[in-house]
Amino acid sequence: MRTFYLICTVVLLQIQCNSQPEFNNENRVTAIMINPEITFQTIDNFGASDAWSCQYAGSWPDEQKNRVADLLFSLEENADGSLKGIGLSGWRFNIGAGSADQKGETKINDPWRRTECFLQPDGTYNWEKQAGQRWFLQAAKQRGVECFVGFVNSPPVWLTKNGRANSDGGNSMNLPKENLAKFSSFLVEVTKNIQQKEGILFNYLSPVNEPQWDWKDGQEGSPWTNLEIAELCRQLGNDLQKSGLSTKISITDAGQLNHLYDRGNDANRGFQIREFFSKQSENYLGNIPEVAHKIAGHSYFTTTNDKVLSEVRTKLSNEIEKVDPELEFWMSEYCILGDNDGFKGNGRDLGMETALFVANVIHTDLTVANACAWQWWLAVSPYDFKDGLVYIDKSETGGNIYDSKLLWALGNYSRFIRPGAKRISAEVQENPDLKISAFRNENGDLVVVIVNRNKNDKNIQIELPGNLKHVATIYETSESSSLLKKKNINLNESLNIPNQCIWTIVITS
């Protein structure tokens, strides 16, 4: 899905974390070449999910929950010129399965990981449920978010095989086959009600989440085989068509990216690009109009180092090119899990180490896997893990709010690369340690993001076509700044790129 356009100009660079950029004559200058004629994927959104804390944070006092919403969604500036938030353009709404409504054994020890459900045991609907999450839906809409995804971890507990929101094991769905149509009907009813009550139509429904895992306990979830996913999507596609809703079905939110192109832990739950988008497959879904022409996967456990990052995403891109070059890829969920060459997921980190690690993942997902969307896992977290953008006290009534450098690092992308932007060519010679990507927004603005994880500064020379003079605004995230604005930067001069920080350079059309 690569197209080529002529683009006015593009730039790249990086920066001094604590000072205005300045040239250092003692270091060799690295040339950065821009080819404005080459474009790649179109960006749809940068987002996050409301699981699980928004059900509580959405009931906090107005001042506190609006502060959280501003950090996530706002495109405005404060009176002093600082940015209120990171301007997320996508929001995933967790359609709950009802484990919070159960009095019996849920196998989910943490109440904050349980969810309410609109569907009740008697088959009626209670549209007062999930009120906190619905508040954040409205907050996102009011601040300009346009892409909304309703995603499901488990079918409603009243429909499942075992009466729980997680599985007894095995690779098959925790849903009797005779309830498949009821589950599909539930998703359509929820989508219709959210549209009627909130004025928000889900752009996408994601009916299964990480189907490769067995989901025995700890949180809501269900395994699904590829055959079961295909059967569900055919039923749901038919029901959406009858309803008149324009919502599309998004698949498959794979638990790891390699499950999209190889067998993973189970051949019946792997090879999902060819399974669903190769015309030779029995599970082909490309002929169902209600199925979005995209494949979604999660970057978990494939981010150990640059070698693994690149290899996995190259294989993913190659598989798409082989099966269906027009197929989009969305990276629809990520946080730091497991041990990544000693960089572990446990232990909250509000500083730059985690921010730079994740920025490197974002860069690779965008430039190697050609991701059209990039979405973080927990927008709001109460936990001692590297899983949140905004952290809060684990309280149902209110508490402290903590922003993170990770929040602002994602903002180096999300706040400035807007829906409809094209990624454009940006190449750097002799300095692969600098992670540089460039984009052109629909309004003509050029956006360049540069990640410098090194402990050393770098000098760069930006090579642009023609003899035009370029002045830009730079936004810096470092240990001491959070999208700090630096105006009137002359891009025709060599610049000193500082260590361990992220710059976004915006060149106004």
Residue ranges and their predicted role:
Residues 1-25:
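Bacterial Sec-dependent N-terminal signal peptides
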Residues 26-202, 217-230, 234, 238:
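N-terminal catalytic cores of secreted or lumenal carbohydrate-active enzymes
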Residues 44-50, 89-95, 99, 147-151, ...:
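Structural recognition of the beta-strand scaffold that forms the well-ordered cores
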Residues 192, 222-361, 368:
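Noncatalytic carbohydrate-binding groove/subsite architecture in carbohydrate-active enzymes
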Residues 328-412, 424-429:
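Aromatic/acidic polysaccharide-binding cleft in carbohydrate-active enzymes
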Residues 429-468, 500:
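Carbohydrate-binding surface patches
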Residues 465-482:
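Solvent-exposed beta-hairpin/edge-strand motifs
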Residues 486-509:
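C-terminal beta-strand-rich structural cap/linker in extracellular carbohydrate-active enzymes
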